[in-house]
Design a protein with these regions (language model features):
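A nucleotide-sugar donor-handling region in carbohydrate enzymes
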Residues: 33-38, 57, 134-209, 311, ...
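A donor-sugar binding/catalytic signature common to diverse glycosyltransferases
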Residues: 88-89, 95-98, 110-111, 138, ...
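Donor-nucleotide binding loops and adjacent catalytic segments primarily
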Residues: 33-36, 41-43, 178-268, 369
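Short alpha-helical donor nucleotide-sugar binding micro-motif in glycosyltransferases
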Residues: 74, 78, 264-269
Length: 370
């Protein structure tokens, strides 16, 4: 059984889901954490992923309520389905599904384990620690993430590094990305716009941070007179509407795009500004100029290769960063090395084999079933 609930999970697990569907009696579950069409269903269609076998409608009015709903609804489903193993990815509320599986002695596997930003104000940091320390088998992307898990006392024999799945995903859908007509549809020219994506609670909810974001977007649109395309997460749009924000004409708010269209925009933008956790990986793999709109991160391996610059919402730092990025060679003309742990071509094969290899191991060693 694989449990998903948000767009990043669906994207990163797309090839793993296909592999598990081919080789196992696979059950796909969507918790409904972010069941907005633009955020979820459009990605199932664009990535050619089948619809989930179960949709749990677990979204609550708060993070705590959502986690509680996920735990209780998944627990009931586990009784019904009786899966041999459970797989989750990342650090979302949907990953709390690992708790009832653990309680029922079902082997649990966690992809993207070991990420740490060392800032407990970040909600995902809390979930990471809970899930990492609950999972039977942790599958980090990098050597650094693996070292964090060992430092926290987790057994090395229950940690298997896989590398990031995103290279395999991007390669599989490359033709679709190349064929995207999104620039023409939006009336954009290559290299003549900025692309922005921001949705994190710490950038949207506090008044001070949100005010800085609004100032940044307006300043960016005035600096070069270029369109600023903002892929607007529902949380961000809700905050904008509630605050009655007025943006400059060049700031264009658009609904979340398909995977193919969004990556086409990233490849062709003058620069991408994002607070997404995936920006470090995508900018390293695809080699486009990128700024991380955060004050902390959980991917030091990306910083070691300078694949992205971390600037927060500081307008001066953003402008300074953009001046540097304009000189960055793009595409195959690299000046920055691709992060080694982001270049794995066969992560879906690894994950399939790890699950099949360790399910019986966990039953025997952890649960003493035989």
């Amino acid at each position: 059984m694989t449990v998903v609930g948000t767009r990043p999970e669906i994207i990163r697990l797309s090839r793993v889901i296909a592999k598990l569907d081919t080789h196992t009696d696979h059950v796909l579950v969507h918790t409904g954490q972010n069941y907005d069409y633009e955020l979820n269903e459009i990605f199932f269609e664009d990535l050619g992923i089948r619809k989930p076998d179960h949709f749990l409608n677990a979204a609550g009015d708060s993070g705590a309520e959502t986690m509680g709903n996920v735990i209780s609804t998944v627990d009931k489903l586990l009784v019904e389905v009786q899966p041999e193993a459970l797989l989750v990815l990342g650090d979302t509320n949907s990953c709390s599904s690992i708790i009832p599986a653990k309680r029922r002695h079902i082997p649990t596997f966690h992809m993207e384990a070991g990420n740490r930003c060392f800032d407990m104000r970040v909600p995902e940091e809390i979930i990471r620690k809970i899930v990492d320390h609950t999972a039977d088998i942790n599958m980090p992307y990098s050597d650094i993430a693996r070292s964090y898990l060992i430092r926290e006392g987790l057994s090395p024999d229950m940690i298997v590094k896989t590398g990031s799945p995103i290279t395999e995903v991007l390669e599989h859908y490359k033709a679709r990305i190349d064929a995207s007509n999104v620039l023409a549809e939006l009336g954009l020219k290559e290299g003549q716009y900025f692309l922005v994506s921001t949705h994190r609670e710490e950038n949207i909810e506090p008044d001070v941070a949100f005010g800085r974001l609004v100032t940044l977007l307006n300043t960016l649109s005035e600096a070069d007179g270029l369109p600023v395309i903002v892929s607007t997460h529902p949380r961000t749009q809700k905050r904008i509407d509630a605050a009655g924000v007025k943006f400059n004409d060049q700031v264009r708010l658009i609904k979340p795009l398909s995977f193919s269209d969004y990556n086409k925009l990233q490849l062709c933008a003058r620069a991408v500004l994002s607070d997404s956790g995936t920006i470090t990986e995508e900018s390293s793999i695809l080699n486009f100029p990128a700024l991380n709109l955060r004050e902390q991160h959980e991917r030091p391996e990306g910083m070691e290769e300078a694949s992205v610059m971390m600037v927060g919402l500081n307008v001066e730092r953003v402008m300074q960063g953009l001046e540097i990025l304009v000189h960055q060679p793009r595409g195959v003309e690299r000046s920055l090395r691709q992060v080694g742990d982001y270049s794995m071509p066969n992560v879906s094969d690894k994950v399939l084999r790890i699950i099949l290899s360790y399910t019986d191991y966990v039953n025997r060693v952890v649960w003493k079933k035989y």
